[in-house]
Amino acid sequence: IPADMLARMRAEVDDLVARHPDVRPELLSGAHNPWGQSAKILGSQAWLDFCRFPEIVDMVEQLIGPDIILWGSQLFCKPAGHGMAVPWHQDGQYWPIDPLATVTVRIAVDDSLPENGCMRYIPGSHKPRSVVAHEFVEASNVAIRQQVAQLDESLAKDDALYAGQISIHDVYLIHGSSENRS
């Protein structure tokens, strides 16, 4: 991501968090929607513009073809010392799309490293092209309330990103992250 766009994104993150002090930063969804949504999050046109960045759209097109629609966005902003964990899951478990011909684009606004809870994934878990069994999570200190029922966490790899880098993953990829302990 170009430096000027990254600076604008950081300013938009700060603004979005400041405008919604009653919502944990990890739960700010729909930032691309300046008209609000069911969670009463009022986003901004700037986020919609970020999501339409031509170089990112071109990468997505290479993976899923030219028929692209942005239907959701999520800000995973994990404050130091108390940022929520994201249990192991597949995006396809949550997404209301059929068929699941979609991807997730992650944009690192700040460094996303193991020490501050970067995304982790299970290599090859997307290859069967199916959603595995998930179970309800009782804990309240997590960003989502379902997790993969059976998993060998020893296979996990970090998806560390530096500010301005992006990562794209498949809807079937098993992934999650720990809380921010930095």
Where are these regions (language model features)?
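Residues that flank catalytic or metal-binding motifs in active/ligand-binding sites
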Residues: 43, 71, 101, 115-117, ...
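Double-stranded beta-helix
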Residues: 112-178
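A short, structural micro-pattern
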Residues: 69, 99-101, 182
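A structural signal for well-ordered alpha-helical scaffolds and beta->alpha junctions
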Residues: 53-57, 102, 137, 141
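Non-heme Fe(II)-dependent double-stranded beta-helix
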Residues: 2-97, 134
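Short, intrinsically disordered, charge-balanced linker/junction segments flanking boundaries
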Residues: 1, 177-182
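Short acidic/polar capping segments at secondary-structure boundaries
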Residues: 75-82, 92-93, 100-101, 109-114, ...
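Short, conserved beta-strand element in jelly-roll/cupin
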Residues: 89, 96-114, 160-163, 168
